[in-house]
Amino acid sequence: MTYFLNSDFSKLPLCESIIEVSRAIRQDFPSKRVIEDLKHKVEVARNYVVSENLPFLKLRKLIKLFYKNWKFECASGIYKLSDVLWLDHVLKTHKGTAVSLGIIILHIAQQLNLPLMPVIFPTQLILRADNGNGNMWLINPFNGDTLNKHVLKVWLKGNISPTAELYNNYLNKVQYFEVVRKMLDILKSALMEERNLELALNVSNVLLKIDPKNPYEIRDRGLIYSQLECDHVALTDLIYFVEHCPDDPISEILKIQIHSMEKKVITLH
């Protein structure tokens, strides 16, 4: 993970950041192939949109190229969530999630200087383009469809709460750095669910390099260590969380787990 530690990836272009963290997590991540594939797609896209003069019209052509011509789409059927998050798999299959598809098209738009930015909506990543005249174009990265406020309200009520409201700040643009964190959070959860604990631990360690004192990240690392039966290390992380977040409801559950683990460690000694 040395190269990751030496990189201030928050200042890197989006896909370069994702490639850096992917290399830190997966030893077999094919960085060279991914970089070459992305460069090729940028050049094809550049030639495809060149006939348009206005950035907004270029962006519309890019959306058409990405979803209609290249046929990038949301994954369906039976699949592992982690497979539709890794950029190498998504570039190979053209099937991904909102965040992985969004990352690729954001990268291409960034390289072409097109006005596309990420929005971390409560239900998923969405894309936003401003035309400079006060008009905002919201795009679903799953399929390139235009989103309106009615659809967003339905998403909130269906996924968050029947009483959820749509607030303006839900549509605020975020920095690419936040997209990297979002992807890592989803990837960590997916790997834990798939019982790929060694890779999940690598993701957790990357997140802790970004935010070393985040008690929730430390808690998750402790839970992974406990599943790997590394109780000694797990105890340190879980106790840290309980001490720093005593009012969190999960702390009471963790106290029981900590007590059980402490008895086990004492017995082994």
UniProtKB/Swiss-Prot annotation:
A Pfam family matched in the record: Transglut_core2
Domain of life: Bacteria
SUPFAM superfamilies in the cross-refs: TPR-like
Family in the record: Belongs to the UPF0162 family.
Protein name listed in UniProt: UPF0162 protein bbp_163
